[in-house]
């Protein structure tokens, strides 16, 4: 009995060790009763699931334990709070100017850390450039290309001093020359955005431009095509507060300044097609321009055009004529609604969910203009844009 008392007393001589032991035992117990999550809305990422014993026998010991380690990390109880705590320690205690691969700049702006083209981009960028050139040659005089610079290129003074930045100007200059040589029009929005940098043209916590930034670029396109721009003053602007974007999902800084999404209340119909073959599909589901249910979830930007559908068609407001085809990434989602003032039909293709070439679709619809609208960051890395260059 005396020995047992001495052993118990010796444990309490090390209160820190005891506290840590109890903490990890409690965390382990909490993990056992906490359901696994398939997706982290806050981080906008898929979470690892428990590896099966079949993967142990098929892939070997190392792969099984690697998968198990990632599973434990992704499914730890209170993961969102742990990520936030790590960010707080890094930025407030250690005074780091980056967190989760995101640079923390002035004016509460966040920027991705970019040293240069990664290995895959050195292969993808030339392929996508060649695809643009091919599209311009196949449809001379119809193709307009708009590649949007990153916020860091417009606001270099807000990026932390000495931070790595990709020289986008060098690549955009080369792309401009390539497009024009191939018979297309390069709509260079760099100066336009720089002229309006005192306004809210990029989100602070997200990688997209705002509806205001998109509008200034849209005005420049209208000037190039001889069109009368959409008039915001005759439409009702709606706002959604409390938007935290993709940069925040990675950085999770405690003092992040939330963004505001603005959109115009437009009645235009949008048809999302079921695409099973090249050309114009016959069947689709018709809805409105915006999925306003998304305004009550974390990824509010997904409300524009109901996300990144493979092929959709928007009806104009009745004042415009002709048809335009927009080949795009998500930067175009807040841009496209403005085109309702200029065209009777606006067809929108996103190659992430459209697995065919464009020639049959173009032949079926006889477009008056084609617009390729991407952020440069997406253009240099998109593994699907090569389809624009494929004949057929």
Regions found by a protein language model. Give the residues of each.
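Extracellular glycan-modifying ectodomains
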Residues: 1-392
């Amino acid at each position: 009995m005396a020995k047992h008392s001495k052993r118990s007393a010796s444990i309490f001589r090390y209160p820190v060790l005891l506290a840590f032991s109890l903490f990890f035992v409690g965390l382990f117990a909490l993990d056992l009763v906490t359901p696994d999550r398939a997706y982290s809305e806050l981080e906008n990422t898929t979470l690892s699931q428990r590896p099966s014993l079949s993967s142990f026998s098929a892939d070997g010991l190392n792969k099984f334990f690697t998968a198990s380690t990632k599973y434990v990390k992704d499914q730890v109880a209170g993961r969102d709070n742990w990520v936030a705590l790590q960010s707080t320690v890094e930025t407030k205690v250690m005074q780091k100017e980056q967190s989760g691969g995101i640079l923390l700049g002035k004016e509460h702006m966040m920027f991705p850390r970019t040293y240069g083209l990664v290995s895959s981009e050195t292969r993808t960028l030339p392929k996508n450039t060649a695809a643009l050139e091919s599209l311009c040659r196949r449809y001379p005089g119809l193709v307009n290309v708009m590649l949007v610079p990153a916020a860091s290129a417009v606001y270099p003074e807000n990026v932390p001093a000495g931070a790595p930045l990709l020289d986008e100007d060098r690549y955009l200059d080369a792309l401009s020359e390539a497009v024009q040589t191939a018979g297309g029009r390069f709509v260079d929005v760099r100066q336009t955005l720089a002229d309006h940098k005192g306004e809210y043209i990029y989100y602070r916590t997200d990688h997209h431009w705002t509806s205001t930034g998109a509008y200034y670029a849209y005005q420049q396109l209208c000037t190039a095509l001889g069109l009368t721009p959409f008039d915001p003053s005759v439409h009702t602007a709606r706002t959604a507060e409390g938007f935290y974007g993709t940069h925040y999902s990675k950085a999770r800084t405690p003092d992040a300044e939330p963004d505001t999404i603005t959109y115009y209340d437009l009645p235009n119909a949008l048809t999302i097609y079921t695409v099973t073959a090249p050309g114009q599909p016959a069947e689709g589901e018709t809805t409105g321009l915006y999925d306003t249910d998304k305004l009550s979830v974390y990824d509010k930007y997904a409300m524009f055009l109901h996300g990144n559908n493979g092929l959709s068609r928007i009806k104009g407001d009745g004042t415009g004529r002709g048809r335009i085809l927009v080949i795009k990434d998500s930067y175009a989602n807040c841009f496209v609604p403005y085109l309702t003032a200029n065209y009777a039909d606006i067809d929108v293709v996103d190659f992430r969910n459209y697995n065919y070439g464009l020639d049959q679709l173009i032949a079926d619809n006889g477009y008056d203009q084609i617009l390729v609208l991407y952020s440069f960051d997406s253009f240099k890395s998109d593994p699907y844009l090569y389809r624009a260059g494929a004949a057929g």
